[in-house]
């Protein structure tokens, strides 16, 4: 099956990747180690991915380059359906320049791993291979690669994706984007569901204002 290339990610990351690749050759930069997921086991409120994202969710996000410069803003309407241990999560994006995009995740709950953490695997059209991760306490971390088409060539970037549940109806997402093992940017998203989401409905995905 042919993977759909994300034009949105391509435009976001192309200039940053070229710049950082040059810096890497000259300076040997490396990315920082992240938190050990298992250390968050006692954090609350507990996150269960399939129950949190079942039904309608709205989200607001930004993309920053590795230097902290704001590159893009966006909003998202999400709709999740659960069938047994499978969560199908549809995402519809509107960016601040008027561009639209969408993604559908199919996420499977695998059960507890040897480390005692609940494990998940997921697939989406613009993700190469399978995203894999786990949940501890109020946090989820999963890793995946996205293949972009740039100037007629394919380029793969890596996402180190963290979700932290803050309230029954609120979660914060921080995803670190890297290439050649070097962080090139980060995505921050706030997810709202329940009454918080209803207060913002209908979410305008036609016009940015």
Q: Can you name each region flagged by the protein language model?
A:
Residues 33-38, 76, 82, 95, ...:
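Sequence-level preference for short, compositionally simple segments enriched
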Residues 60, 65-150:
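Central antiparallel beta-sheet cores of small beta-barrel/beta-sandwich binding domains
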Residues 70-76, 154-159, 183-185:
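Amphipathic hydrophobic-ligand
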Residues 130-134, 139-176:
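Surface-exposed interaction patches
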């Amino acid at each position: 099956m042919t993977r759909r290339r994300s034009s949105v990610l391509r435009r976001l990351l192309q200039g940053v990747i070229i710049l950082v690749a040059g810096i890497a050759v000259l300076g040997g930069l490396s990315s920082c180690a992240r938190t050990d997921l298992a250390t968050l086991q006692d954090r609350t409120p507990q996150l269960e991915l399939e129950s949190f994202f079942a039904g309608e969710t709205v989200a607001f996000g930004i993309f920053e380059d590795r230097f902290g410069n704001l590159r893009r803003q966006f909003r998202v309407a999400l709709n999740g359906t659960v069938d047994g241990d499978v969560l199908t999560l549809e995402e519809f994006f509107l960016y601040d320049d008027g561009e639209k995009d969408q993604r559908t995740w199919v996420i499977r709950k695998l059960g507890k791993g040897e480390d005692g953490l609940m494990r998940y695997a997921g697939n989406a059209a613009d993700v190469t291979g399978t995203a894999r991760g786990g949940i501890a306490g109020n946090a989820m971390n999963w890793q995946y690669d996205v293949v972009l088409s740039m100037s007629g060539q394919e380029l793969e970037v890596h996402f180190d994706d963290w979700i932290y549940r803050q309230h029954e109806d609120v979660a914060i997402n921080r995803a670190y984007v890297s290439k050649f093992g070097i962080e090139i940017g980060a995505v921050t998203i706030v997810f709202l569901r329940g009454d918080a989401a209803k207060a913002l409905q209908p979410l305008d995905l036609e016009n940015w204002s």
